[in-house]
């Protein structure tokens, strides 16, 4: 297998042009006027509904913004179990793609050029390849708007996850939920903003299936 590092610096490979790019979505998130306590009955019912969604898929766009670069790509997230899930990033401008595949042996990151890296230490691999520690195991829950049971998070008056923070390897990720799909139960996120210092990930989910 070929060795490669910091794949996501290949922003031109995954860049999406056009006014519909997730990069144009709003980033500023206002604090909710009313914060619902974690033991609220409706919120607890919402959490139970989210917990029942154990196998699902989501498609949309993901954007990356830093002082050095900004790009966006399509994403296809397929989640089956905590040790069986995958994320594919692709562009409608080329046939190139980037895949992250989780199995019982750890995480494999590969691209359409034949480059591949695998490691049991997933956090270290994400740091090596992407340049930032990102808890990919937690992403399955973040995407659904399902916080850690004893985590530091805020619930809005619609009984939706509004914000939370997550510490990993001395770094802090702050998540803000800007919009939800409210035409189905349970309400699932439509636009999420993840921030880690000067780096921002904007995730827009266009399709949910479970």
Curated annotation (Swiss-Prot):
Lipid-anchored residues (N-palmitoyl cysteine): 19
GO annotation, cellular component aspect: cell outer membrane
Main localization (coarse): membrane
GO biological process: lipoprotein localization to outer membrane; protein transport
Membrane topology: Lipid-anchor
Covalently attached lipid (S-diacylglycerol cysteine), positions: 19
Keyword Signal appears in the UniProt entry: yes
Cross-referenced Pfam families: LolB
Cellular localisation: Cell outer membrane
Alphabetical list of InterPro entries matching this protein: LolA/LolB/LppX (IPR029046), OM_lipoprot_LolB (IPR004565)
Keywords for the protein's UniProt record, in alphabetical order: Cell outer membrane, Chaperone, Lipoprotein, Membrane, Palmitate, Protein transport, Signal, Transport
Signal peptide stretch: 1-18
Assembly, per entry: Monomer.
Function: Plays a critical role in the incorporation of lipoproteins in the outer membrane after they are released by the LolA protein.
NCBIfam families per the UniProt record, alphabetical: lolB (TIGR00548)
Entry similarity comment: Belongs to the LolB family.
Name of the featured protein: Outer-membrane lipoprotein LolB
Species of origin: Actinobacillus pleuropneumoniae serotype 3 (strain JL03)
Annotated gene: lolB
